[in-house]
């Protein structure tokens, strides 16, 4: 209500505007000039520390800030992930560490439908009838695949009456097998009730990212193009570690949400590393490997925040990195705007112009994609 009254979208760093209690970091007063949140995205107010001090007459000083240089998310040491996840579980949950990390965390088993789909993915002789049969054994999943194909985003002529219709007439075998796998996995862990204020809803972020990746993949030269369906799946599941963090560390997840709200200029990796000692990318990739998912998918989740990654299966994390950053720079997603370096386009063999075209097509169909996401976005 307070933000609406002043027509603001964020809490401004100007205490007199609100009657709320104010706590400020005392080291700020050692700086000659300050940049404080204005209440509008991308707009800061520059003020001298002396003038700002006069606004703090009813505020309380404290010493609680941490220099970013002391927080170092593990971007490039995947071999340390298991030990770091174990340490976080031991430190921040009441769970007693067992010999196997997966027993300690109590991760749900891979759904039966997903197990069948994984077997089909690696079967070169799999047919449309095979995937239709598997999807239709899970009525909720079948309904989701049909509604996906019926979305105005795909503009299919006539009604989509069955899973077979969705495959043959609209989506194709490769996309459906990966879409079905993504939806099946997405249901294994519930959406958390808590989330950072103003965060893009989980499935909206997932669907937009997958749609952008679909367009980017088509723009990559055929000889270096990664598997389109697997790229799409990487987009759908890129933020799966967010669900895992909420499942494994429930009380601390709320703390992460509040820290993200208080630090909109920071990536989630810094906040999670500071509070837990691990990031959603680490635990998401670990779970993909535990479930026996394709290594390309684990790499996509693990290295998606590193625009310079050029290791094994680099195209998949590079595509996620590019899609997420381009969406974020257009106001979709959470965290600060991030530069998209030219080397990222060069490594994928795609021009900046073609990437912009791909994202423009997705944003032109934003209403259709948002309607699709609405079916998934309530906690379940």
Regions found by a protein language model. Give the residues of each.
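Terminal helices and disordered tails flanking the catalytic cores of nucleotide-processing hydrolases
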Residues: 94, 325, 338, 342-380
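Short linear loop/turn motifs
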Residues: 2-9, 70-71, 302-306, 358-363
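Short secondary-structure transition/capping segments
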Residues: 43-56, 209, 269-279, 342-351
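A broad, structure-centric signal for solvent-exposed, well-ordered loop/edge residues
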Residues: 9-10, 54, 142, 308, ...
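Short, surface-exposed acidic
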Residues: 2-3, 228, 295-299, 350-359
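Extended, low-hydrophobicity, polar/charged segments
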Residues: 1-83
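A short, terminal or domain-edge coil/loop segment
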Residues: 51-71, 213, 278-286, 349-362
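Conserved alpha-helical "signature site"
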Residues: 72-340, 379
């Amino acid at each position: 209500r307070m933000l609406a009254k002043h027509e603001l979208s964020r809490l401004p760093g100007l205490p007199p505007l609100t009657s709320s209690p104010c706590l400020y970091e005392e080291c700020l007063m050692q700086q000659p000039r300050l940049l404080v949140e204005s209440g509008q995205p991308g707009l800061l107010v520059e003020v001298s520390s002396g003038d700002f001090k006069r606004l703090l007459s009813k505020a309380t000083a404290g010493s609680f800030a941490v220099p970013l240089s002391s927080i170092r998310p593990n971007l490039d040491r995947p071999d340390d992930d298991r030990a770091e996840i174990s340490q976080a579980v031991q430190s921040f949950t009441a769970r007693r560490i067992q010999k196997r990390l997966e027993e300690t965390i109590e991760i749900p088993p891979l759904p039966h439908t997903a197990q069948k789909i994984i077997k089909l993915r690696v079967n070169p002789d799999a047919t449309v009838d095979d995937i239709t049969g598997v999807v239709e054994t899970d009525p909720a999943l079948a309904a989701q695949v049909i509604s996906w194909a019926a979305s105005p985003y795909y503009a299919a002529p006539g009604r989509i009456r069955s899973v077979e219709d969705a495959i043959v007439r609209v989506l194709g075998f490769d996309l459906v097998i990966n879409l079905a796998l993504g939806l099946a996995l997405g249901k294994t862990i519930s959406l958390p009730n808590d989330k950072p204020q103003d965060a893009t809803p989980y499935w909206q972020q997932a669907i937009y990212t997958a749609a952008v990746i679909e367009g980017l993949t088509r723009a990559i030269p055929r000889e270096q193009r990664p598997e389109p369906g697997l790229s799409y799946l990487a987009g759908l599941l890129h933020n799966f570690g967010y669900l895992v963090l909420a499942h494994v560390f429930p009380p601390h997840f709320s703390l992460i949400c509040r820290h993200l709200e208080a630090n909109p200029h920071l990536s989630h990796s810094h906040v999670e590393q500071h509070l837990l000692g691990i990031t959603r990318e680490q635990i998401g990739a670990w779970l993909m490997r535990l479930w026996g998912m394709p290594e390309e998918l684990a790499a996509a989740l693990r290295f998606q925040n590193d625009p310079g990654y050029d290791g094994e299966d680099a195209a998949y994390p590079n595509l996620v990195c590019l899609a997420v950053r381009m969406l974020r720079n257009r106001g979709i997603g959470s965290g600060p705007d991030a530069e998209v370096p030219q080397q990222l386009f060069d490594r994928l063999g795609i021009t900046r112009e073609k990437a912009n075209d791909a994202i423009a097509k997705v944003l032109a169909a934003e209403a259709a994609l948002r309607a699709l996401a609405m079916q998934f976005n309530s906690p379940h």
